Amino acid sequence: MGKYKILVVTGDSLLAGSTNLVQLWLVGEHAEADLGKQLRPLRGRKTELEIDVPLHLGRLLVVKLRKHKGLLDSDWFCKWITVQGPGIQGEAFFPCYSWVQGKETIYLPEGTALKVNDDTKNLFRKYREQELEDRRNVYRWGSWKEGLILPIAGSTERDLPRNQRFMEDKDLDFSLSLAKVLKDFAIKGTLDFVSRVQHLEDYQKVFPHSKTALAGRVRDSWKEDALFGYQFLNGANPMLLRRSKRLPARLVLPPGMEDLQTQLEKELKAGSLFEADFSLLDGVKPNVIIFKQQHVAAPLVMLKLQSDGRLLPMVIQLQPPRHGCPPPLLFLPSDPPMAWLLAKIWVRSSDFQVHQLQSHLLRGHLMAEVISVATMRSLPSLHPIYKLLAPHFRYTMEINTLARNNLVSEWGIFDLVVSTGSGGHVDILQRATACLTYRSFCPPDDLADRGLLDVKSSLYARDALRLWEIISRYVGRMVELFYKNDREVKEDPELQVWCREVTEIGLLGAQDRGFPLSLESRAQLCRFVTMCIFTCTGQHASTHLGQLDWYSWIPNGPCTMRKPPPTSKNVTEGDILDALPCLQQARMQITFTKFLGRHQPVMVALGQHKEEYFSDPGARAVLKQFQEELAVMDKEIEVRNASLDLPYEYLRPSMVENSVTI
């Protein structure tokens, strides 16, 4: 009994407020009080209420909300609610960060994280069970293509749960940016139909005026072997390179190449031989664009790591050997310059395909979606792991739905301009899905498996390890707050259902590739959650942020090749130009590269989310410590980069987005 002071906070986005009346209830340990239709929430406002309650509620457990329709039904975005009880009762915090729609009743538990086994009086059991039942009806697994990890159900973004849709600022930025690049393409692209590329320098016609500093450097130095090798370490796709343990079986050296054999074996023995194998592309059916056949290769590149840290190519094989056919041609740095250049261009085009489909789309976007859908279906909002992960799912489901409908759909961007479009891209995604391993999503294991832990010139490796360690410490501290021992992990039924939902359902039974079906210890839980957060943040950033830098100069990363791989070394500049994309294709590549790679004005950096899901002081202190460690790493990278010829910023915490949003 007594007065309760209630503060209701509405979101800041354009349509966050509502003209409808909202009814509130306070649910305590002993009783429930209906406060009536007290509220008409306005955008960006904090509404204060002071109400006499004649009942003894006891400790507050839940705030209930129901929006009543007026003549017009308008949704309401509630950030959070605080309630100050009478007497010595402290202030209770009820996080919401979701839309209140229609006539549904929303239950907001008090923000202290609570595992189901810690609720010994079963005060919250019915709320968490009802929440999960409702969520499983809304967050349903869908299916896009056979053999691919599962997406959220829904044909378009309008089919998605309201809480997973873009806010108005994001939606407006996305729509205006897309309209601008399409307008530029329509205006400038008309001239491309009457223009021909006569020299490599002619690609300057489509080179963006608002280029990045690194893009300009790539344009000026793209022919250099050192920059070619550098990209495997620190470029748009640092996920393919590995140290050679033996000479690849596919590398067939014809008679007369004994010197090359000796050099390769020397580097192999010294531990300085590396390889980039694009066998994933072997046999992929190439696209036909405007009635013209495009072409795909599956190269192998052997590289040597020099004492100065430079990675230099030694030999390029553009196709694997075929039974009954002569050994494929091998290209060497000593070959005629145009032949060697064309071989490197073929590698760069192949890397474009593998990067965009395997490293970026599958391992970044689609994997993050599996984690987010499984979490929404399996962990209630009271669960500490839900509270820990929730900020890292913002906008992921909508951006992925848009990608499936516009980028890799029938008549999407890949079909219109990329050599692996019109079905080849799906084939690649299916092959890559079958190769997904748990270790490959954990940088300490992945970099060890690929032999990159001690490669000092791999700035990606150094920064990925550092970021993983910071996230791991953050997760570890959170886990220690809520799980006192391994037994508590094993006996958390919601946690075990979540783990199985990720591995067995979302990833189509990936336990045979190392993904866990259960979590048996705090250490195992920490590793799994760290993998989830790193995937949604650093993993995506490392393969997303470099697109403008490395693909703005078309010859350095052509989206398609219009001629088959060369069968002789008698190559002219005209042969190269005939193979590279025409100006229309090049401008289309630049158009979607600029759109996807642009700076996000509503970007939230890693760990900088404003949403407070935890009311626990200990958890808030852990987040603050995480932010401090990220700030230290960010400053150290800034200082390091100032002395580098080619700065590496893709895993700088201030550049890493808190979730997959573009």
Swiss-Prot record:
**One of the protein's GO biological processes:** lipid oxidation
Show the stretches that span the lipid bilayer.
Answer: none
The cofactor named in the record is:
Fe cation
Question: EC number(s) per UniProt?
Answer: 1.13.11.-, 1.13.11.31
Q: Which GO terms describe its molecular function?
A: arachidonate 12(S)-lipoxygenase activity; arachidonate 15-lipoxygenase activity; iron ion binding; linoleate 13S-lipoxygenase activity
Q: How is its activity regulated?
A: Arachidonate 12-lipoxygenase activity is decreased when the pH decreases from 7.4 to 6.0.
InterPro entries of this UniProt entry? LipOase (IPR000907), LipOase_C (IPR013819), LipOase_C_sf (IPR036226), LipOase_CS (IPR020834), LipOase_Fe_BS (IPR020833), LipOase_mml (IPR001885), PLAT/LH2_dom (IPR001024), PLAT/LH2_dom_sf (IPR036392)
Q: Which reaction does it catalyse?
A: (5Z,8Z,11Z,14Z)-eicosatetraenoate + O2 = (12S)-hydroperoxy-(5Z,8Z,10E,14Z)-eicosatetraenoate; 1-O-methyl-(9Z,12Z)-octadecadienoate + O2 = 1-O-methyl-(13S)-hydroperoxy-(9Z,11E)-octadecadienoate; (8Z,11Z,14Z)-eicosatrienoate + O2 = (12S)-hydroperoxy-(8Z,10E,14Z)-eicosatrienoate; (5Z,8Z,11Z)-eicosatrienoate + O2 = (12S)-hydroperoxy-(5Z,8Z,10E)-eicosatrienoate
SUPFAM superfamilies in alphabetical order: Lipase/lipooxygenase domain (PLAT/LH2 domain), Lipoxigenase
Family label: Belongs to the lipoxygenase family.
Protein name (database record): Polyunsaturated fatty acid (12S)/(13S)-lipoxygenase, epidermal-type
Native source organism of the sequence: Rattus norvegicus
Q: Which gene encodes it?
A: Alox12e
